[in-house]
Design a protein with these regions (language model features):
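Short, Lys/Arg-enriched N-terminal segments with co-localized hydrophobic residues
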Residues: 16-26
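Extreme N-terminal tail/first-helix region
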Residues: 26-47
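Acidic, metal-coordinating catalytic segment for phosphate/diphosphate chemistry
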Residues: 42-78, 84
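Unchanged
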Residues: 66, 75-78, 109-195, 215-221
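A glycine-rich, hydrophobic loop/mini-helix early in the fold
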Residues: 76-104
Length: 221
């Protein structure tokens, strides 16, 4: 595992997020039928090896028509790996579209027909070399709701056992461990900007504080 002094140490005080069931009822109970859009037609604008783009014509709630151009994504999984000493596993990886090395939790896209948990186990092993004896599904993240179908399933993993990584020949990333408080501080200072990692950090903070509960399941490593 690569040693990384990414985070400056120091106190990080955060107020716990409200429990999910405390959201104002008006936000969830109001009928939304007056907001829906009806698809009239759909055509493929681009069909790539990984991503596809569609261009749809929709009927708006007021009867007018408009176009919706969006990316069709196979979905992905992100894993929050908890080490026995209380630290978490993270990665540093270059992301070409933004030209930066990013701090991220281990993640990867779903293969066709793949179960999200199986994908999480596979990605954790391939990218970090670790396996886990306990897993818990936390939730999901819709990454870019205005222009993409992508959904990222969020899992926690613990009971970690180290082993050799299984990176693809053309895959390059560093793995390191960090104290959660250092991760919180890095997020607060804007040093972590990856959306899935910010969402996972919110989950991590609330799970470790006891505000949010997980249903842990035993799995063979």
């Amino acid at each position: 595992m690569v040693s990384c002094k990414l985070f400056a140490r120091g106190p990080a005080r955060f107020r716990a997020a409200p429990a999910l069931n405390s959201i104002t009822p008006a936000m969830t109970d109001k009928p939304d039928s007056h907001l829906y859009e009806e698809r009239i037609s759909s055509e493929a604008a681009y069909d790539g090896r990984f991503l596809k783009i569609r261009n749809d014509v929709v009927r708006l709630p007021n009867g007018n028509t408009s176009t919706r151009e969006y990316v069709v994504h196979p979905g992905a999984v992100v894993v929050i790996p908890l080490l026995d000493d209380g630290r978490v596993l993270l990665e540093r990886q270059y992301r070409y579209p933004i030209g930066r090395v990013m701090t991220e939790f281990p993640a990867g896209k779903l293969d066709p027909g793949e179960d999200p948990l199986a994908c999480g186990k596979r990605e954790l092993l391939e990218e970090t070399g670790y396996t886990a004896t306990q897993w818990a599904r936390a939730g999901a993240l819709h990454l870019a709701i205005a222009y993409s179908t992508e959904i990222i399933h969020i899992y926690f993993a613990r009971g970690l056992r180290a082993g050799p990584r299984q990176l693809d020949q053309d895959e390059f990333l560093d793995v390191f461990s960090a104290d959660p408080a250092d991760l919180y501080a890095a997020c607060a200072k804007g040093e972590v900007t990856d959306a899935k990692t910010l969402t996972c950090t919110l989950w991590l903070q609330n799970v470790l504080s006891g505000a949010w509960q997980l249903d842990w399941q035993e799995h063979a490593a």
